[in-house]
């Protein structure tokens, strides 16, 4: 089939490649414009644009597709059979959604209707969901409200972070989208209700669970509150990897990997941290207090309940440090305090 592909980050690249390798014709790729990054503020293309150029594909970079009528016309002239959208980053207007005869299909990173919107992967970890998944959804004007054609579940491990989980989900999204293509093609053209009936899509209103929305994360969301529980701090560090931040001696410190020293989670934690579980009494120190630097592992810090082990971090102006290198870099003495943002 002739496919118009919409996507921007690394997450979308496997789907673009898989559709091409499956023999479909990618008539065009729509992605976000180049953005300035790094200290030199150099213009950098999106991951999808970089891959599309290597593949010799035609690329479109509208700043706002809703308002760019010229780009809309150019895309219509490509006459795609359908559009495939994976993490594009803009809401498509109704006329764009209605243009392809076989519809617009989105690869979404959650088990809808849970976690509609931006950042479903991060929110599934933040909220402690035991599993997530990916689905192929028929797009409509509402935010991720369309019916689901097919989906797959994926467990979330205690030590999964936003990056590792996204990598697994991006591969699964690509597999699922390739699987969906012959189903969509076999349903043929016709009105949207007719095609959906032939496809036997699942309306979200008929599915279990209430709808929830993965709102955009704020600067404050990334700041560590040491008065939270060890498990909630751990979830924040893992979900927002590599951007959860605290203060150490008035400098910003990114926390890259932590492990909550909680007995009921023992089986999910590495064996080398098991001797640390239960070593310190709960509530014996103010939250954010350094309890001990443990050789080869990292720094143990108090929380509102059980302590947490900080195993990897990045101090402002420095590179990543783990275990002993982290201990050396922080030079943390017992009873020292991590800071909080006012």
Swiss-Prot record:
Keywords: Protein biosynthesis, Transferase. It catalyses: L-methionyl-tRNA(fMet) + (6R)-10-formyltetrahydrofolate = N-formyl-L-methionyl-tRNA(fMet) + (6S)-5,6,7,8-tetrahydrofolate + H(+). Pfam families: Formyl_trans_C, Formyl_trans_N. (6S)-5,6,7,8-tetrahydrofolate binds at residues 110-113. GO terms for cellular component: cytosol. Its EC number is 2.1.2.9. It comes from the Bacteria. Coiled coil: none annotated. InterPro entries: Fmt, Formyl_trans_C, Formyl_transf_N, Formyl_transf_N_sf, Formyl_transferase-like_C_sf, Met-tRNA-FMT_C, Met-tRNA-FMT_N. Transmembrane segments: none annotated. One of its GO terms (molecular function) is methionyl-tRNA formyltransferase activity. Attaches a formyl group to the free amino group of methionyl-tRNA(fMet). The formyl group appears to play a dual role in the initiator identity of N-formylmethionyl-tRNA by promoting its recognition by IF2 and preventing the misappropriation of this tRNA by the elongation apparatus. Belongs to the Fmt family. HAMAP family: Formyl_trans. This is Methionyl-tRNA formyltransferase. It comes from Synechococcus sp. (strain CC9311). The lineage of its organism: Bacteria, Bacillati, Cyanobacteriota, Cyanophyceae, Synechococcales.
């Amino acid at each position: 089939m002739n496919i118009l592909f919409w996507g921007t980050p690394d997450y979308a690249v496997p789907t673009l490649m898989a559709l091409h390798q499956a023999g479909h014709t990618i008539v065009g790729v729509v992605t976000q414009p180049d953005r300035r990054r790094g200290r030199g503020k150099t213009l950098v293309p999106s991951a999808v644009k970089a891959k599309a150029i290597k593949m010799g594909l035609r690329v479109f970079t509208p700043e706002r597709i809703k308002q760019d009528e010229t780009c809309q016309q150019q895309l219509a002239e490509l006459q795609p059979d359908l559009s495939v959208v994976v993490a594009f980053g803009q809401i498509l207007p109704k006329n764009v959604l209605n243009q392809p005869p076989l519809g617009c299909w989105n690869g979404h990173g959650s088990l809808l209707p849970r976690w509609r919107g931006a950042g479903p992967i991060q929110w599934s970890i933040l909220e402690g969901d035991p599993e997530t998944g990916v689905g192929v959804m028929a797009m409509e004007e509402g935010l991720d409200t369309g019916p689901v054609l097919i989906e797959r579940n994926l467990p979330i491990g205690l030590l999964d972070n936003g990056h590792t989980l996204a990598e697994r989900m991006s591969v699964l999204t690509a597999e699922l989208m390739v699987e969906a293509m012959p189903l969509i093609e076999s349903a043929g053209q016709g009105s949207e209700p007719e095609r959906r009936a032939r496809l036997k899509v699942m309306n979200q209103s008929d599915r279990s669970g209430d709808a929830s929305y993965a709102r955009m994360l704020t600067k404050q969301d990334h700041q560590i509150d040491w008065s939270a529980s060890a498990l909630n701090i751990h979830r924040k560090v893992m979900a927002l990897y590599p951007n959860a931040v605290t203060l150490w001696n008035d400098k910003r410190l990114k926390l890259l990997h932590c492990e909550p020293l909680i007995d009921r989670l023992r089986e999910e934690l590495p064996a080398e941290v098991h001797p640390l579980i239960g070593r310190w009494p709960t509530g014996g120190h103010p939250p954010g207090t350094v309890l001990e630097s443990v050789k080869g592992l990292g720094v143990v810090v108090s929380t509102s309940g059980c302590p947490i082990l900080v195993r990897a971090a990045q101090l402002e102006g420095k590179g990543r440090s783990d275990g002993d290198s982290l201990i050396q870099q922080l030079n943390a003495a017992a009873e020292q305090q991590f800071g909080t943002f006012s």
